[in-house]
Amino acid sequence: MPTTTLQIPTADGLADAFAAFPDSGRRHPGLLMYPDGFGIRPVLRDMAAELAGHGYYVLVPNVFYRNGPTPVIELPDYIGEEARSGVMAQVMPLIGAHTAERARSDAAAYLAFLNGRPEVSDGPVAVTGYCIGGLLAMRTAAAHPDKVAAVAGFHAPVGADGPELFSTVTAQVHLGHAEGDITPEELGELNRSLDAAGVGFTSEIYPGTVHGFTMSDTDAFSASGLRRHWDRLLPLLERSLPAG
């Protein structure tokens, strides 16, 4: 599976990125993947390669590029209980500084870059994200409804901007919530907001999961949660994007 590192021009400089894509010589649908707060690392590269194997050109940007290239912070190979507090102390200021205005500006640059790649077929793309990346994915879909056909967020605070964020979303949506992140009552409120905005969506709690359940390099990982993530994400992409 071909992979490469790239530099994406943005309003504030160059964002380094990772890309994985099929080795076919043909053009394929584009997919913008926003990492979780821990950033680009082997587990994200593996997930991008998995998606590329299903026929997509997958672009994974370093959303914290303003603070330096990947790795923005040094991470242990495995983020367990002992390491987590120290890692989070570094990550949270980065998340706090990544404002909605910055996110919208970057999203425009990422989409323009993705759509301009010679390996990417014409037409709308999909956007997926994990943790804070899920919120960035939803912001991207809201800001660019003509360019995003599908959006997925996993263990993501997608409601953080309020229900008005959903008013311009035309993409098909799947949200996979950690059981430890959201109550059934909160899920009902979120789903009613999506309904009211006319969004086509599925939104569910993944049983027995905690925040970060898709990430196999952390103690939050759930093998069953990751399988459900693939079982929901891949059909969404197949329904929403042309065949790769």
Model-identified regions with their sequence ranges:
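N-terminal cap/leader regions of alpha/beta-hydrolase-fold enzymes
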Residues: M1-G244
